[in-house]
């Protein structure tokens, strides 16, 4: 019976199409001059001159007018012919201008009446949403929002409510191009997948978004710990942003927002399209993941306004850049044109989100001074991800990490550091860490979160190309260990000896891999003393000192 129901659901999903407006929408969806250059222009401000804000996806869903326009414009965008340079297929989901244009077109198609004006008003300040994958979901809701889960949805539009293909569930290739997509079996699938479940349908497996939800939720504690460390101790833009910079400069602090971002690619895809670098942008999740990453970068910039991009050599060839060529803030960001005369955007010209006509609620300067915003964000960072988590764990475990008579609190942050060649294996892989012996079933490691007395304590995900670019770039990532030590009741003076005895790691690609086969792999454990003043929201970090080498 369950199998029959599954097949019926698949049949309904296959039959569902885009929204039917009752008119030919090809001319509306296409740009007026398909032969002209695609120029990335700033989106317009509101009538009162303010910069519209990008909302979190659950916040947008609460506004039915904006939500309808978002789903309808996503659906229309995905429906554009793959031959069009402005189609989802060719742009692969990173061009917000098209969504804004389509939202305004669709708003104008609603029949006259109160709702039509509400849709037109919503379209004026329409901006892409983000999904906040660093915050726990509201009570009673799934961590991975349920708007991604269902293949079909009932959607209101200018012609009333219709059952359509959910544009957040997948992108359907039209036509499927097996030659371009290269990887087997992904090349044979007609739509993007997440955690493809071949037990239901082998030729065209369904996406298992329940598995994606469980695995991503298991990674939330380490994501929040890593973000707290990044936002409280990384003051250099290159170090914060780039997973190749620290190794190239022989730095001791080896994390980056790029490395944290890799977690959502690997575990949001789980062997589906998000897991593969060249295919990831086809998945609708890519768009919301990268707007969230953009938000985090914007928040860090507001906290560190004087730090900016330093010159760095390109790690591999691209269509316009040779390996080893120095890239700096004035280097053209091809293929993104800023004007019809052939001028490209640069890091300098795109430094602020306002240059593109949007901001975030957390970075909006309306009615604020920059220093006031910086202080506000310092408090928010601690509230979102921060040090109170350590202090709470410490109190609950009965471990005092500082003198009670002191106004300051101290603890030692232990961190596992990974250095590895970006093309060490043929594509993505992960390094799993354990306190004690790992489970013999490596298929369980991705979902393990250290609860229920299992030994798994975290993962460093490596989102990488297969071995075809000739890159010899070394990259890095980290895993904070302190929370796992506190949860196990390890006294501060015993931490180092405990880690020497118990800390283990395993490498997992498509299956378990011998570490000796992983090019450039180096793992050590370092620690830093952290001070938290009683009246401060900002931890002060001591020098990071290497204590042991796990693999070299």
Each predicted region: which residue ranges?
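Cleavable N-terminal signal peptides of Sec/SRP-targeted secreted and luminal proteins
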Residues: 1-17
